UniProtKB/Swiss-Prot annotation:
It comes from Nitrobacter hamburgensis (strain DSM 10229 / NCIMB 13809 / X14). CDD domains: Argininosuccinate_lyase. SUPFAM superfamilies: L-aspartase-like. InterPro entries: Arg_succ_lyase_C, Argininosuccinate_lyase, Fumarase/histidase_N, Fumarate_lyase_CS, Fumarate_lyase_fam, Fumarate_lyase_N, L-Aspartase-like. NCBIfam families: argH. Its EC number is 4.3.2.1. Belongs to the lyase 1 family. Argininosuccinate lyase subfamily. This is Argininosuccinate lyase. Pathway: Amino-acid biosynthesis; L-arginine biosynthesis; L-arginine from L-ornithine and carbamoyl phosphate: step 3/3. GO terms for molecular function: argininosuccinate lyase activity. Transmembrane segments: none annotated. Pfam families: ASL_C2, Lyase_1. It is an enzyme of class 4 (lyase). GO terms for biological process: arginine biosynthetic process via ornithine; L-arginine biosynthetic process.
Length: 465
């Protein structure tokens, strides 16, 4: 006969391989706080509904508090034979308070129990991630204000395109992080329904109060369908999707830092705090923090892909496949958390080489569009014609091996006789960025205005809690 808590109908215990593949305590032990919180609420509801006695509920609550302390101080004995966090907690509770512990599982299954625990866990992850992304935004905004007028090259196809400001470039990641936070917030809203009380799949015949347990656990409402409640993992998938997109944003920025810190480019420098050396080459300073942020994206995207594949063919309701929903997700959430903190540190740490940035901003005839715009504004030339004329002027400068602003006026006039000396004023990189005053443009005053507005918004969020 099996000695498992579920073993009443079994004539013998499981094979050792079955034990090994079935156990999940190494992973779901991380749900201990959520499991205990949900059990305390469930016990209180059972007592309020007259399903168990008030004394039993009191003993259960006190015992769960003790177990929570034991886990936190490292004295709790996790037993692999008990499979998971739910049975480990219930088993220890039975050792402490006896038969009353067996009443805790009334009107509840491990199916709705784990669904509740994991929703609470993911909700906590979302809240922590939002706070981390807000701190990342604050670091970006602080540096954007410092460098609202620092000119650097803007790129398309990794080729110099037009001058921008370093502050404007950093502000792009503020906006990306804002969308990331919005996606996490959306996921949280859909997540915030309680599966507790759905039992195995069909609900229960006991007169439970699901509204009360949902409210006590901070959920907006109980889930409306018991089958859906125990078999849904959309909340994990959606949160992993938000995490994957956020990690891709961080990876893009990390890639830029790797490129910018290369001696061949030399636009920024990271201090020793965020670089490492080589075991053989004494001179090396490697941007390993940025490279590892870039690499961790694979773990996050991989976790999303893995869970999508796990869930794709599962009929209703709960299937043991769903036990594989946690490890990859937990690792992904941890990887994202570390990546955000690392990027926040690097943003505060990096030092731009302003002279090199300014010089690079003018490379590749980056102010050619400014000349074309001058032809449109001053000579009323159609833009397509202005584009063609400017292209010929760029070709002339390239043939002479000079920058656009170094080309003689008469050489420009050889292409378009109506060009005047006034056109030369628009060819400096400073004039170029100052002229981009359209909403969302790179003009320093735009950057300062948007950065200050964002800082006020973050401060308002902080005060609202």
């Amino acid at each position: 006969m099996s000695n498992k808590m579920w073993g009443g109908r079994f004539g013998e215990g499981p094979d050792a391989i079955m034990e090994e593949i079935n156990v999940s305590i190494d992973v779901d032990r991380h749900l201990y706080a959520q499991d205990i919180a949900a059990s305390k609420v469930h016990a209180a509801m059972l007592a309020a509904q007259g399903i168990i006695t008030a004394d039993d509920a009191k003993n259960i609550d006190k015992g769960l508090d003790t177990i929570l302390s034991e886990i936190r101080n490292g004295t709790f004995d996790f037993k692999r034979a008990l499979e998971d966090i739910h049975m480990n907690v219930e088993g220890r509770l039975g050792e402490m308070i006896g038969a009353a512990a067996g009443r805790l599982h009334t009107a509840r299954s491990r199916n709705d129990q784990v669904a509740t625990d994991f929703r609470l866990y993911v909700r906590d992850v979302i809240d922590e991630t939002d706070a981390a992304l807000a701190a990342f935004q604050h670091a970006l905004l602080t540096r954007a204000l410092e460098h609202s007028g620092t000119v650097m090259p803007g790129f398309t196809h990794l080729q110099t395109a037009q001058p921008v400001t370093f502050g404007h470039h950093l502000m792009a990641y503020v906006e990306m992080a804002a969308r990331d936070r919005g996606r996490f917030a959306d996921a949280r809203r859909r997540l915030n329904e309680s599966p507790l009380g759905a039992a195995a799949l069909a609900g229960t015949s006991f007169p439970i109060d699901r509204d009360a347990t949902a409210k006590a656990l901070g959920f907006d409402r109980p889930m409306a369908n018991s089958l859906d409640a125990v078999s849904d993992r959309d909340f994990v998938l959606e949160t992993l999707s938000a995490a994957a997109i956020a990690s891709i944003h961080l990876s893009r920025f990390a890639e830029e830092i790797v490129i910018w810190t290369s001696p061949l480019v030399g636009l920024v420098r990271l201090s020793d705090k965020f670089t490492t050396g080589s075991s053989i080459m004494p001179q090396k300073r490697n941007p390993d923090a940025a490279e590892l942020v870039r690499a961790k994206t694979g773990r996050v995207v991989g976790a999303l892909t893995g869970l999508l594949i796990v869930m794709k063919g599962l009929p209703l309701a709960y299937q043991k496949d769903m036990q594989e929903d946690k490890q990859g997700a937990m690792e992904a959430f941890g990887a994202l958390s570390l990546a955000i903190r690392a990027m926040t540190g690097m943003v505060a740490d990096l030092v731009p080489d302003e002279a090199r940035m300014k010089a690079a901003a003018g490379d590749g005839y980056a102010t050619a569009t400014d000349l074309a715009d001058w032809l449109v504004r001053t000579l009323k030339m159609p833009f397509r014609d202005a584009h063609h004329v400017t292209g010929r002027i760029v070709a002339a400068a390239s043939k002479q091996g000079v920058a656009l602003h170094e080309l003689a006026l008469q050489d420009m006039q050889a292409v378009e006789p109506r060009i005047t000396r006034d056109a030369l004023a628009v060819l400096s990189v400073e004039a170029s960025v100052k002229s981009r005053t359209s909403y969302g443009g790179t003009a320093p005053k735009n950057v300062r205005s948007q950065a200050n507005a964002w800082l006020k918004r973050l401060e308002k969020e902080r005060k609202l809690g």
